[in-house]
């Protein structure tokens, strides 16, 4: 269910704005998206795991807040990110 260190490093490298960037909204949203996708797969075989479902909802809301922030600050980066991650339209 967790993101492995190698996978997280790859996600950071793909979405970083500069070398060593780990805290930009783009990187945070990409890591959250990976965790959300992992939990979604988990629920396909564990449908009644309501404790983890709460965690999933918290991750989705955190990602939503970060995306709202990014959209408010820089709409071009927002549209590029949702296109790259395959979110929304």
Curated annotation (Swiss-Prot):
The gene is rpsO. Belongs to the universal ribosomal protein uS15 family. NCBIfam families: S15_bact. The keyword rRNA-binding applies. One of the primary rRNA binding proteins, it binds directly to 16S rRNA where it helps nucleate assembly of the platform of the 30S subunit by binding and bridging several RNA helices of the 16S rRNA. Forms an intersubunit bridge (bridge B4) with the 23S rRNA of the 50S subunit in the ribosome. Coiled coil: none annotated. Keywords: Ribonucleoprotein, Ribosomal protein, RNA-binding, rRNA-binding. It comes from the Bacteria. HAMAP family: Ribosomal_uS15_B. Pfam families: Ribosomal_S15. It comes from Rhizorhabdus wittichii (strain DSM 6014 / CCUG 31198 / JCM 15750 / NBRC 105917 / EY 4224 / RW1) (Sphingomonas wittichii). GO terms for cellular component: cytosolic small ribosomal subunit. Part of the 30S ribosomal subunit. Forms a bridge to the 50S subunit in the 70S ribosome, contacting the 23S rRNA. This is Small ribosomal subunit protein uS15. One of its GO terms (biological process) is translation. GO terms for molecular function: rRNA binding; structural constituent of ribosome. The keyword Glycosyltransferase does not apply.
């Amino acid at each position: 269910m967790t993101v492995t260190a190698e996978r997280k490093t790859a996600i950071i490298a793909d979405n970083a704005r500069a070398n060593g960037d780990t805290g930009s909204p783009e990187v945070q949203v990409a890591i959250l998206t990976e965790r959300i996708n992992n939990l979604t797969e988990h629920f396909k075989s564990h449908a009644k795991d309501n404790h983890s479902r709460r965690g999933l909802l918290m991750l989705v809301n955190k990602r939503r807040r970060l995306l709202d922030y990014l959209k408010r600050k820089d709409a071009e980066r927002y549209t590029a990110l949702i296109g790259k991650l395959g979110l929304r339209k």
